[in-house]
Amino acid sequence: MPLLSFWKSNRDEVLKMTVEQVVSSAGDGHLRDGSEASKEFRGYLRVCPSESLFNYARYCLENSFDKSGIILQDIVNELGRRLDFEVEDGLYQGKKTVVGFDGIWRSKSDPDILVEVKTTDYIAVSLDRIAEYKERLYAERRIEPNASMLVVVGREDTGALEAQVRGSRYAWDMRLISVERLIKLVQIKEKSDDPTTLTQIRQLLRPFEYTKIDRIIDVIFTTAVDVEQQIAEHPPVEEGDKEHGTFKQDRTDPDLLSAKRVEAVEAFARAKGKELVRYSRTLFWSADKTFRVCCAVSKRYEGDYQPYWYAFHPNWDRFLGEGKDSYFLLSCMDRAEAYAVPYSVLDKNKKSLNMTDRNDRSYWHVALTTMEDGSLAINLSRIGKKLALKPFAFGWSAATKAP
């Protein structure tokens, strides 16, 4: 059975496999350039959870086995995709007539990055050879002349390689990063919903004053976690709601919110027959980026008039708007169901929602209210109407049909 078919029918079993076992289940089990095994393995990496990618990378570094280097190469390139780069996979085995690069990471707003992956720096790295790859790729018009070079190394103790880069003529064109810190960058991106985070990450990967960027990433990672733990959105009282009382401002554990979000997204993906990967804290998409989901979670507030409240941010709006089939998922902490509002419906009704618009931040208010029959609806506060959510409801059963 092809690996992706096995994944769809036996997800839990695949997640228990080591990366060696996963590769052996792909095609004939031997990764070669242009092989079916390579196609299946790379296809699987596109849809597997980020946490599995992290574990696979660490397995390659902690265990000695055949082809660990080329497996790590594919994993590192997938980490690049999780950072929203357009990635061109390189060759497993170099050829005289073909440039033997490991990967090219591209983005619309930043220079290209030529990536070289090394499991260790015990073996001398030829900086001249990497630079030659860059020159040949530019001659073939496959990268821009201002492209930089990034060496991704398995070991964190890379002092000798750092000194080699600093003392070379490539000091301002090349940077180093360990696999573990590349993993941290993906974690930072997936914990954040701030679009500037991705911009900052890309700037870190480009040449600047420091040769190795691990310590800077550590600081950013710690800061991001601290900020996330302090975040608590408090809903404003909507117009016309003041007579129904105020809200008790109790914070909900971020881990509980995250678990509920994943629960809702996975249930919706199953019902739709889709494989979704995390783009950021609340955003998810398919490997081809056409199917997109934004999932917000609300605790249960006191009173029935406005029991749930969500902020809908402009960057979420852009993300969903750029997809072909997009949904805004409204999940409730105390319910085993959620509501998948098609983006077309939300976009049509945004103008009827209250909005906070400040210089530093803006967002629409998505306040849920209770209907006479006990079901929920979005309160279209500006026009005094309600958008019933019952047509968009789905439960946690895998057999449940999504709207």
Regions found by a protein language model. Name each.
Residues 175-272, 279, 339, 344-403:
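Non-catalytic C-terminal interaction segments of nucleic acid-processing enzymes
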Residues 48-91, 241-289, 299:
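Acidic-basic catalytic patches of nuclease active cores, encompassing PD-(D/E)XK
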Residues 1-70, 226-252:
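Interdomain/boundary linker segments immediately adjacent to catalytic/signaling cores
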Residues 65-70, 74-225:
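Catalytic core segments in nucleotide and nucleic-acid processing enzymes
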Residues 121-132, 159-162, 299-321, 338-341, ...:
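Active-site-adjacent loop/helix micro-motif of nuclease/hydrolase catalytic cores
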Residues 288, 296-300, 330-337, 371:
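Short, flexible beta-strand-to-coil junctions
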Residues 146-148, 280-281, 289-291, 314-316, ...:
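Short, surface-exposed beta-edge/turn micro-motifs
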Residues 99-106, 278-294:
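Short acidic loop-to-beta-strand element that houses the catalytic metal-binding Asp/Glu
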